[in-house]
């Protein structure tokens, strides 16, 4: 269960980071806020068609660090990491699930569906049924219908 303070902090940082990142032609993929022993670790993942460069990361880190400092977020000392999402890109927003239909994904749920909490399979569809968003996953030649609101974590799976 995510602490409500951490959830709000993540949302606040997302709201500040998204326009900064978009102004450089990039897309915000994920914000992680982790409380370490004496400081916060804030991780920003961003992407764009064609990939992210080291210069992109450096520029966004400088700009976003200034913005976070002005808004006193997080409220204690922090380390800011800015990077591309990598090969195991997190799937966070609805458009991520639409974009990566047909790809292999790893999904962890807050409660079991059909007796399973962790899924690894092909994302076949992302649909809405009776006002609820559903992922259709093929795993071991069987189809599973997973409610979006049960997902704790979802990532692409890269095969070498």
Swiss-Prot record:
Keywords: Cytoplasm, Ribosome biogenesis. One of its GO terms (cellular component) is cytosol. It comes from the Bacteria. InterPro entries: Ribosome_maturation_RimP, RimP_C, RimP_C_sf, RimP_N, RimP_N_sf. One of its GO terms (biological process) is ribosomal small subunit assembly. Signal peptide: none annotated. It is found in: Cytoplasm. PANTHER family: RIBOSOME MATURATION FACTOR RIMP. Belongs to the RimP family. Required for maturation of 30S ribosomal subunits. This is Ribosome maturation factor RimP. The lineage of its organism: Bacteria, Pseudomonadati, Thermodesulfobacteriota, Syntrophia, Syntrophales. The gene is rimP.
